[in-house]
């Protein structure tokens, strides 16, 4: 295929020539997009590219914000100038006092002199005195502090406010542009990018970019300004000491940078592991009925836990690195103190180059510079995370779609006949390039005709329909419409000419009327009613309480398969399309409904092209032309009679299907609460591009094996009127999250009890670390006090002693910081893992009715597992360390402060609440501004999820723009909120920064009063103020976790509520009756039942029917009569409200749940497969033991699956993809049958078990099922008479009761409801 020639893009604007290109080039172009997507992860975007969406206004906001951040950064070095001068004033004053205390010295004429006994003055000393008014000096310095406080308040407010507003504006654009771009992508791109990852990109990744460009940016500028100016001030004041200190400072900066980078890396690994665990949880909870039916709870908990272990390891490593490097930095800082004061005091005392104030200025300037340089690394972490997140977002934004559904390019034909032709089309899906689906396909579909396409599973029928819609482009050849290559036509225009109805139709979470209106935006209510009547949907809609305003639930979950299909047909008919594509469109309808729909289709056939993929004889026979497919090629074409005479593919299919059918129209028995229609032979064999791959998430809210009505889902605002969501929320009784009492801390700690040794050692480390700050204040003030001593040797001795203490404190800090970091990381991660595991286990142990509750949707539960478990650490883990640290800090600081000056301590204590509050506010600011309006963003997230999960349907009906508009409308609320929050946060940040200067201003002013009036030593003033101010800010940082603490208690309460809940049907309980000789006798005794989520709808109304061991019972009846509900009662998904289900004479309520389910095997119409290998999916049939490979192969052979599996490259190790998306419907169904067979159950439940198979496969599988039924009790729900006519008992149900029962012959003889159903296909009333 390397140099095969293909036709491509033949009619573009400005050119009429037919261009020829090498398919190699085109295929490479296609695949390169996917490869680039993967490459994009390795090369991050440049930092300034983060601001690519900034406007002129944004640039001005950022410029002014940056200028204010620069001025704010200057304030700290400015304070050091004041502090150094003030230190010199204090020392000069104290030196004067010390000298005057010497006997024989006095102050005469502002000079200190010796006074001899004769009163003659000796003026050789010459030291000035009496000129320094310490109190007035302190007033001056206090005013300087107050002035800087005002500057910091204003600049701090502006820098944060302006940057946050600019970021909000840019993030708003980024969200809009990225969603618009994703909605433009071709379907092949979605095959290779999971919906879950894309949703994460819209939420988490964009939030991370926001963190990078919002408040972190001005804080980074501020810190860097402080850092640079600090170093410059140090060099200016004294280069010698600066060079000595600066030799150590890079190590501090490096340590801080390593922390930032390591934490970022480990967090990334940890999040990836949690994401995998989250995907497992989502898959399992979405498929809860299958998990319960096959007793997979324990296995799924183990699978979930495996991913949690990886996350735990990375979390602990992160704690170790943080603990070590935090200790390393503290150690370096204290060693730096020791070195600076030792060498600096030498320069002050011996060389006289510096004053003590200059020494303090230089030292604190360099320390301030290094610390701010290190702290800036936390911003670098946010920038790195933002860049990493932006890489995938920008790659998506910059990628050019191969098929751009919103492109204005291409022709729009004035008149369209609807003649479609395939010219030597070869095709493979982008996600499976090695599997050829269409192979040199050539066929003509004429206008005004109904063309039926038939063929076995995997022959390429539905793929051909997707190429007509231009979901994909052929690898070779071309598809033409009225002679025009469809690649030259405008894609939006093309799709408006096409109506599509799929076998598994997707309805959106809004009203029935709006769902039909999706077919045509300007459709009036009359048009909608007309279409509903044509689709035979009008009667059942009018029977609903709210008629056309009835909400269909997520994915149409409130409706049966037949009802959904009729609404989808109405949606297609309302647009009056020139081309109508029907992919098993009437498979879920009974004969009467189908006949009415076929009549409606025949009416519009004139001037329209109708292409139908079907295997019902009645559907196919009505076609003008039938085309037979085999191995991706059209092998025959003709009318029904012509093809029967030819005796080819069609003849084989008809022969197989007609065998055993007693009447021509005897297929109309259709199930009730079933999900979607008869799944036939979807051809995309083993390809993620299979026709159903985009439908999975919309069907997740109810497991494919559940065939009952579910709880109402909240609607989304993806309709023409943006207010619909709000109106619906007001009008409908949608449950809200109930208020919950916070959990007691004692119980949280009890849950963390196994880690008590780690917590104990961590608490010891935290206590020591808490004492370090007040100890620093003590030592620092002690050194300053020595400079006023008159004896130089005494000064030197005391300074050396204090320097040695600094070294000792540094070494201790290294150990205790590491101990605290490691111990609490270990205990916290183990707690999180335990909570997630127990929470997940408790979820899987709940009864199925619990999952029907809106609040317990898969999305809500997986979110609860992720967020609540992490939030519980807010009351345990590292938070305990923070609290112990702060408590020790404050206690030691208060002892020191009150010991040396209780009066000054009380004055500073007045600012304590403000200082604590400022610390809390500041810490909360620095954690980032990612707290957008949660509710509105969740709704926006629901819109993206619904749009992307159902992208094929959205693209097919051309509603991309409508989803985009709805998404953008939901973004307005958090966008407006961000402006308000920017002002609040800006003020809080400014206040948190300035309050320390205000406190210092008042404290030094009062200290200036106490020194002369009460004889307080100046070093005590420094000691008391430093101790209290530093401890207050530390307390503030601790109190900033109060919201986390409160959230933790609420999250823990939700967990404990889940753990404490006693489900009415206890899966994990070992209690209940078990017996050895399980026979399989089943008796339904006067069973009455309503679903917990729909208590006003009586589903079973006194069901009574029995089946003896080894017999087959078949349920038949119209939609909604309760057939599948009876199966759910037998599985004990629910218990009857009244009556009993008896198993071998035992009341099912008293039977052990796991024992009961282990003896039941089930095959559903839409089987749920898990994202693992074919072998593992088959083994899932029996989770009580390890199944040998021989048994797996044996089961596969019985299910007619083995040959297909062996034809795959990886055979039984082949991964089936998410929800089995890599397989066709027939292949999935056979895996499900093998899964049931390997279980070797005593009771076999077949719920439309062969409906998804083509006629050929069905016959072979039916033989396997007949064999599997031998010796087993079997309960069958089906609508093909060939499936049920040989049953021992046929029970005809209507409105929740059995109205007739007997064998096929007996019921036909009675000429009642069953006879009517068989002979006319009329529904049972």
From Swiss-Prot:
E.C. designation(s): 7.6.2.-
SUPFAM superfamilies in alphabetical order: ABC transporter transmembrane region, P-loop containing nucleoside triphosphate hydrolases
Domain ABC transporter: 420-656, 1082-1320
GO molecular function, one term: ABC-type bile acid transporter activity
Membrane topology (Extracellular): 84-147, 262-319, 375-759, 820-894, 1005-1014
Membrane-topology descriptor: Multi-pass membrane protein
One biological process term in Gene Ontology: regulation of fatty acid beta-oxidation
Glycan attachment sites: 109, 116, 122, 125, 375, 424, 440, 591, 889
Tissue expression summary: Liver.
Record's comment on post-translational modification: N-glycosylated.
All ranges on the Cytoplasmic side of the membrane: 1-62, 169-240, 341-353, 781-798, 916-983, 1036-1325
Catalytic reactions of this protein: cholate(in) + ATP + H2O = cholate(out) + ADP + phosphate + H(+); taurocholate(in) + ATP + H2O = taurocholate(out) + ADP + phosphate + H(+); glycocholate(in) + ATP + H2O = glycocholate(out) + ADP + phosphate + H(+); glycochenodeoxycholate(in) + ATP + H2O = glycochenodeoxycholate(out) + ADP + phosphate + H(+)
Keywords recorded for this protein, A-Z: ATP-binding, Cell membrane, Endosome, Glycoprotein, Membrane, Nucleotide-binding, Phosphoprotein, Repeat, Translocase, Transmembrane, Transmembrane helix, Transport, Ubl conjugation
Subcellular location: Apical cell membrane; Recycling endosome membrane; Endosome; Cell membrane
Regulation: The uptake of taurocholate is inhibited by taurolithocholate sulfate with an IC(50) of 9 uM. Pravastatin competitively inhibits the transport of taurocholic acid. Cyclosporin A, glibenclamide, rifampicin and troglitazonestrongly competitively inhibit the transport activity of taurocholate. The canalicular transport activity of taurocholate is strongly dependent on canalicular membrane cholesterol content. The uptake of taurocholate is increased by short- and medium-chain fatty acids. Cholesterol increases transport capacity of taurocholate without affecting the affinity for the substrate.
Record-listed ATP binding positions: 455-462, 1117-1124
Top EC group: translocase
Entry-linked InterPro entries: AAA+_ATPase, ABC1_TM_dom, ABC1_TM_sf, ABC_transporter-like_ATP-bd, ABC_transporter-like_CS, P-loop_NTPase, Type_1_exporter
Coiled coil spans: none
Subunit details: Interacts with HAX1. Interacts with the adapter protein complex 2 (AP-2) throught AP2A2 or AP2A1; this interaction regulates cell membrane expression of ABCB11 through its internalization in a clathrin-dependent manner and its subsequent degradation.
Family, similarity comment: Belongs to the ABC transporter superfamily. ABCB family. Multidrug resistance exporter (TC 3.A.1.201) subfamily.
Function: Catalyzes the transport of the major hydrophobic bile salts, such as taurine and glycine-conjugated cholic acid across the canalicular membrane of hepatocytes in an ATP-dependent manner, therefore participates in hepatic bile acid homeostasis and consequently to lipid homeostasis through regulation of biliary lipid secretion in a bile salts dependent manner. Transports taurine-conjugated bile salts more rapidly than glycine-conjugated bile salts.
Protein name, entry field: Bile salt export pump
């Amino acid at each position: 295929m390397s140099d095969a020639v293909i036709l491509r893009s033949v009619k573009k604007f400005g050119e009429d020539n037919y261009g020829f290109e090498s398919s190699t080039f085109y295929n490479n172009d296609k695949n390169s997009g996917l490869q680039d997507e993967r490459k994009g992860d390795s090369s991050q975007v440049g930092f300034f590219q983060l601001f690519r969406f900034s406007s002129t206004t944004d640039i001005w906001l950022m410029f002014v914000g940056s200028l204010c951040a620069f001025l704010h950064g200057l304030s700290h070095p400015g304070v050091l100038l004041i502090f150094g001068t003030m230190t010199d004033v204090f020392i000069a004053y104290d030196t004067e006092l010390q000298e005057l205390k010497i006997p024989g010295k006095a102050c005469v004429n502002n000079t200190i002199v010796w006074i001899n006994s004769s009163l003659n003055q000796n003026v050789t000393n010459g030291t000035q005195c009496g000129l320094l008014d310490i109190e007035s000096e302190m007033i001056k310095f206090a005013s300087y502090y107050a002035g800087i406080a005002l500057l910091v308040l204003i600049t701090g407010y502006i820098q944060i406010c302006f940057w946050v507003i600019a970021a909000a504006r840019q993030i708003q654009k980024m969200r809009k542009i990225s969603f618009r771009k994703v909605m433009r992508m071709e379907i092949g791109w979605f095959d290779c990018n999971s919906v879950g990852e894309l949703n994460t990109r819209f939420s988490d990744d964009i939030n991370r970019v926001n963190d990078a460009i919002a408040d972190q940016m001005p804080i980074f500028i501020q810190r860097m300004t402080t850092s640079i100016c600090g170093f410059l001030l140090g060099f200016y004041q004294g280069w010698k000491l600066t060079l000595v200190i600066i030799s150590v400072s890079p190590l501090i900066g490096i340590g801080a940078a390593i922390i930032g980078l390591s934490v970022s890396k480990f967090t990334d690994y940890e999040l990836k592991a949690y994401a995998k665990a989250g995907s497992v949880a989502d898959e399992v909870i979405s498929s809860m009925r299958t998990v319960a039916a096959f007793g997979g709870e324990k296995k799924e908990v183990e699978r979930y836990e495996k991913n949690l272990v990886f996350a735990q390891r990375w979390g602990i490593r992160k704690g170790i690195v943080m603990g070590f490097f935090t200790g390393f930095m503290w150690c370096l800082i204290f060693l730096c103190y020791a070195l600076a004061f030792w060498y600096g005091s030498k320069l002050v005392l011996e060389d006289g180059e510096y004053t003590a104030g200059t020494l303090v200025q230089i030292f604190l300037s360099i320390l301030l510079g290094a610390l701010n340089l290190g702290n800036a690394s936390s911003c670098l972490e946010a920038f790195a995370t933002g860049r990493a997140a932006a890489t995938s977002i920008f790659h998506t934004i910059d990628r050019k779609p191969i098929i751009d559904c919103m492109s204005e390019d291409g022709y729009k034909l004035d008149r369209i006949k609807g003649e479609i032709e395939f010219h030597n089309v070869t095709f493979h899906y982008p996600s499976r390039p090695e599997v050829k689906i269409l192979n040199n396909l050539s066929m003509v579909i004429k206008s005004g005709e109904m063309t039926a396409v038939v063929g076995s599973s995997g022959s390429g029928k539905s793929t051909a329909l997707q190429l007509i819609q231009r979901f994909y482009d052929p690898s070779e050849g071309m598809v033409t419409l009225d002679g025009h290559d469809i690649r030259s036509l405008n894609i939006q225009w093309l799709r408006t000419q096409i109506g599509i109805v799929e076998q598994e139709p997707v309805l959106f979470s809004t009203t029935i009327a709006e769902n039909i209106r999706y077919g045509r935006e300007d459709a009036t209510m009359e048009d909608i009613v007309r279409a509903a009547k044509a689709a035979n949907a009008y009667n059942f809609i009018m029977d609903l309480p709210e008629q056309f305003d009835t909400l269909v639930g997520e994915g149409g979950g409130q409706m049966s398969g037949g009802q959904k299909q009729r609404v989808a047909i109405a949606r297609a008919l309302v647009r009056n399309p020139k081309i109508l594509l029907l992919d098993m469109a009437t498979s879920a309808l009974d004969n009467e409904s189908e006949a009415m729909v076929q009549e409606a289709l025949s009416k519009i056939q004139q001037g329209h092209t109708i292409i139908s993929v079907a295997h019902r004889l009645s559907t196919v026979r009505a076609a003008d032309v039938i085309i037979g497919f085999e191995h991706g090629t059209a092998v025959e074409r003709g009318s029904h009679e012509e093809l029967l005479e030819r005796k080819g593919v069609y003849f084989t299919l008809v022969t197989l299907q007609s065998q055993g059918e007693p009447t021509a129209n005897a297929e109309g028995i259709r199930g009730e609460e079933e999900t979607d229609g008869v799944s036939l032979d979807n051809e995309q064999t083993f390809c993620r591009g299979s026709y159903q791959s985009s439908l999975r998430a919309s069907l997740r809210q109810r497991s494919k094996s559940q065939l009952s009505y579910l709880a109402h889902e909240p609607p989304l605002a993806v309709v023409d009127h943006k207010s619909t969501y709000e109106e619906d929320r007001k009008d409908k009784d949608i449950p809200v999250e109930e208020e919950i009492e916070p959990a007691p801390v004692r119980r949280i700690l009890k849950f963390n009890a196994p880690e008590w040794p780690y917590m104990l050692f961590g608490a010891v480390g935290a206590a020591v670390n808490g004492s370090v700050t007040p100890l620093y204040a003590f030592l620092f003030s002690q050194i300053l006090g020595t400079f006023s001593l008159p004896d130089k040797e005494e000064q030197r001795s005391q300074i050396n002693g204090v320097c040695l203490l600094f070294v000792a404190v540094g070494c201790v800090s290294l150990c205790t910081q590491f101990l605290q970091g490691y111990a609490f990381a270990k205990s916290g991660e183990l707690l999180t893992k335990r909570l997630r595991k127990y929470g997940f286990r408790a979820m899987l142990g709940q009864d199925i009715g619990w999952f029907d509750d809106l609040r317990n949707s898969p999305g809500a539960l997986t979110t609860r597992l992720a967020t609540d478990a992490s939030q519980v650490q807010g009351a345990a883990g590292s938070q305990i360390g923070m609290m112990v640290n702060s408590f020790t800090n404050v206690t030691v600081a208060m002892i020191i402060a009150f010991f040396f000056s209780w009066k000054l301590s009380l004055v500073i204590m007045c600012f304590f609440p403000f200082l604590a509050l400022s610390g809390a506010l500041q810490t909360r600011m620095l954690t980032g501004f990612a707290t957008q309006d949660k509710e509105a963003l969740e709704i926006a997230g629901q819109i993206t999820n619904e749009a992307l999960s159902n992208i094929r349907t959205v693209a097919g009906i051309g509603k991309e723009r409508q989803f985009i508009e709805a998404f953008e409308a939901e973004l307005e609320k958090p966008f407006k909120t961000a402006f308000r929050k920017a002002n609040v946060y800006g003020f809080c940040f400014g206040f948190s920064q300035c309050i320390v200067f205000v406190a210092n201003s008042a404290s030094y002013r009062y200290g200036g009063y106490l020194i002369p009036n009460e004889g307080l030593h100046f070093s005590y003033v420094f000691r008391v103020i430093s101790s209290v101010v530093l401890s207050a800010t530390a307390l503030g940082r601790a109190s900033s976790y109060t919201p986390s603490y409160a959230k933790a208690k609420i999250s823990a309460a939700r967990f404990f509520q889940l753990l404490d809940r006693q489900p009415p049907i206890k899966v994990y309980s070992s209690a209940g009756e078990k017996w050895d000789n399980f026979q399989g006798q089943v008796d339904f005794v006067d069973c009455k039942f309503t679903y917990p989520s729909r208590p006003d709808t009586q589903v079973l109304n006194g069901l009574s029917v029995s089946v003896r061991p080894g017999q087959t019972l078949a349920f038949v009846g119209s939609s909604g009569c309760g057939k599948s509900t009876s199966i759910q009662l037998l599985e004990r998904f629910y218990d009857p409200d009244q009556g009993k289900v008896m198993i071998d004479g035992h009341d099912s309520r008293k039977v052990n749940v796991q024992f009961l389910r282990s003896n039941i095997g089930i095959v559903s119409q839409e089987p749920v497969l898990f994202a693992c290998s074919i072998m593992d999916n088959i083994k899932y049939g029996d989770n009580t033991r390890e199944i040998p490979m021989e048994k797996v192969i044996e089961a596969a052979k019985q299910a007619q699956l083995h040959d297909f599996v062996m034809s795959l490259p990886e055979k039984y190790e082949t991964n089936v993809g998410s929800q089995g998306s890599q397989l066709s419907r027939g292949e999935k169904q056979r895996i499900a049958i093998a899964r049931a067979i390997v279980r070797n159950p005593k009771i076999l439940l077949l719920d439309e078990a062969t409906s998804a198979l083509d006629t050929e496969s069905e016959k072979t599988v039916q033989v396997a099922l007949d064999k599997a039924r031998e010796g087993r009790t079997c309960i069958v729900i089906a609508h093909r008479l060939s499936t049920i006519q040989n049953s021992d008992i046929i029970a005809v149900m209507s409105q929740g009761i059995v109205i007739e029962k007997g064998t096929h012959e007996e019921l036909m003889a009675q000429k009642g409801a069953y006879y009517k159903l068989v002979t006319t296909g009329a529904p049972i009333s």
